[in-house]
Amino acid sequence: MASGRGASSRWFFTREQLENTPSRRCGVEADKELSCRQQAANLIQEMGQRLNVSQLTINTAIVYMHRFYMHHSFTKFNKNIISSTALFLAAKVEEQARKLEHVIKVAHACLHPLEPLLDTKCDAYLQQTQELVILETIMLQTLGFEITIEHPHTDVVKCTQLVRASKDLAQTSYFMATNSLHLTTFCLQYKPTVIACVCIHLACKWSNWEIPVSTDGKHWWEYVDPTVTLELLDELTHEFLQILEKTPNRLKKIRNWRANQAARKPKVDGQVSETPLLGSSLVQNSILVDSVTGVPTNPSFQKPSTSAFPAPVPLNSGNISVQDSHTSDNLSMLATGMPSTSYGLSSHQEWPQHQDSARTEQLYSQKQETSLSGSQYNINFQQGPSISLHSGLHHRPDKISDHSSVKQEYTHKAGSSKHHGPISTTPGIIPQKMSLDKYREKRKLETLDLDVRDHYIAAQVEQQHKQGQSQAASSSSVTSPIKMKIPIANTEKYMADKKEKSGSLKLRIPIPPTDKSASKEELKMKIKVSSSERHSSSDEGSGKSKHSSPHISRDHKEKHKEHPSSRHHTSSHKHSHSHSGSSSGGSKHSADGIPPTVLRSPVGLSSDGISSSSSSSRKRLHVNDASHNHHSKMSKSSKSSGSSSSSSSSVKQYISSHNSVFNHPLPPPPPVTYQVGYGHLSTLVKLDKKPVETNGPDANHEYSTSSQHMDYKDTFDMLDSLLSAQGMNM
């Protein structure tokens, strides 16, 4: 029970009181009394180590001993039995209780190392047992049952953390706090905060370090205890050094501490001290380790309600400010025997480690940190390119900008590596984005190829029209014997291959069917009507109307008047979008077992054995789907089709008026932009070809491509392609 702040002032004595102790009144000299106190403290230390109690328990027992002899004389109470009693009581207080039997045996072993172990049945053992129990009661009464002790070690740790002291300086200061209990009566004169400042001040002078003034203009000791002054620190430091001079045995142990530590097996930081204070805040966590001795630490630190201190810096050997030359000689003598700042008793296992090992350890830690900053940067790539790079780059922020280039280089190397495990990556998974200029160039090349094939297709269509002119009247009941695959399938397969390589859109382009019975005059009239309808649908497009404009209704009425055979136009529109990316007509053909790339007569194919009634019903469904596509696409893309006035309207005329068959082939129209919107994909595709006539004299062209539909990874890519396709004719 170490630190209960606000201890009673009855346990702080003046110098006059210390010179008038019960021992002094009994004739004991001052030096003799101090020597007895030091011997009792040494016995408590040795017993505590053998009993395996914490250093906190040992320090508490030493304070009990000092306070006890302020009310009792060494001549009446033997220091050895009082030491055992104090440790026995302190172990209980600090919750590390030891059996009375063990305490007596350990005390006997320390006092009589050459004698055999004490028998528990002998009279000496029973006598010591009775004495210890009685003395425990006397000690409790003497202490006034104030068993809570404040130690300066807590303040030493706080202050060294506050100023970000080095590990050596912190260890030296902490060790001097323990020595103050062993060698001096500071615990009877000053508060723990004052003793802590004295220990740090002495450690700084001993190791030639200086803690500079904080940014607030305050000295470091003012943050520990405002009542402390530099004069008081120098005075107590001088007194401490004089006590060390009077104890040559202790000074000899301090000088030989390094040799003893070198001979011992190096201990882990967590095993150096058994003190809970050290284990939690100093040794195990290595909080105070900031730099190697002589190297300035972090120039500032921040604490709540405190300001920043620059790091302690080494002093020159001639700048040690002491009161007289005698103290300077003591410092030089101690520094000669202990040139480093880590020193201590041979019996103390609580603290310091070897100076060289500590310095080597810190150098190694700094070197390891430097190497990690470069090695982790490369290790992350050895584990695979999918690992986040920022976890290895926190030491090297200047390398973050090189992330992309290094990663691309690594991907290239991994692809050509001999190892085909998880290290190698699969290139080409992410589709590449194309700029607008590249997209236009690619589309121009595709358009030229389509023009060449269009001439061949137009020649075949003209020949088919000449053969089928005589059979126009009986077109509804006669099946066409012609079944052929036109090269347009190859054209669209070529387009699909080109698009698949470039990683852009993959579309299915249905060729709008044509009717043969419409005249050129009717076509011109319908083009004008559709053109005016396009402007009206542009106004209504923002509302996404699902119904056609009045112009379209008028268009349908004219077609009903001129083509009585097309009565199925009055049927209601069916919403039958195909989500597989193919057209409705293509889906119907696939259901019938006919490849969609085959152009056939709408009435039926003789090879399939399909009756004319079933063919006409299939034709009716396709017309409804096409009409629905016409209305929905017109409302969705009013502005995107505005750039191609007559061409877009002519395509819409083809879609909305299936039953009309042209008697004469049309000249190739200019490049048109018509909308393809099947399933989830709606985009604009540039067509630079004339609509293809059907094979037979009464054939209705129903066609859909078999190119694959590619899903977009995000909406941004789709919008980019839409805008690129829209700007083709601008």
Curated annotation (Swiss-Prot):
Which residue intervals are annotated with compositional bias (Low complexity) in the record? Answer: 579-588, 606-616, 637-652
Query: What is this protein's name?
Result: Cyclin-T2
Q: Where is this region: Interaction with MDFIC and MDFI?
A: 1-300
| Assigned protein family | Belongs to the cyclin family. Cyclin C subfamily.
Q: What SMART domains does this protein map onto? A: CYCLIN
Q: Is the keyword Phosphoprotein in the record?
A: yes
Report the SS bond pairs.
none
The alphabetized list of GO BP terms reads: cell division; early viral transcription; late viral transcription; positive regulation by host of viral transcription; positive regulation of DNA-templated transcription, elongation; positive regulation of transcription by RNA polymerase II; positive regulation of transcription elongation by RNA polymerase II; regulation of cyclin-dependent protein serine/threonine kinase activity
- Compositional bias (Basic and acidic residues) at which positions? 398-412, 517-543, 552-565
Q: What is the effect of changing N260C?
A: Activation of HIV-1 Tat function
Q: Where is the composition biased (Basic residues)?
A: 566-578
Where are the stretches annotated Disordered? 341-430, 497-652
Q: Which stretches are tagged as biased composition: Polar residues?
A: 341-350, 360-389
Q: Which InterPro entries match?
A: Cyclin-like_dom, Cyclin-like_sf, Cyclin/Ssn8, CYCLIN_CCNT2_rpt1, CYCLIN_CCNT2_rpt2, Cyclin_N
SUPFAM superfamilies the UniProt entry points to: Cyclin-like
GO terms for CC? cyclin/CDK positive transcription elongation factor complex; nucleoplasm; nucleus; perinuclear region of cytoplasm
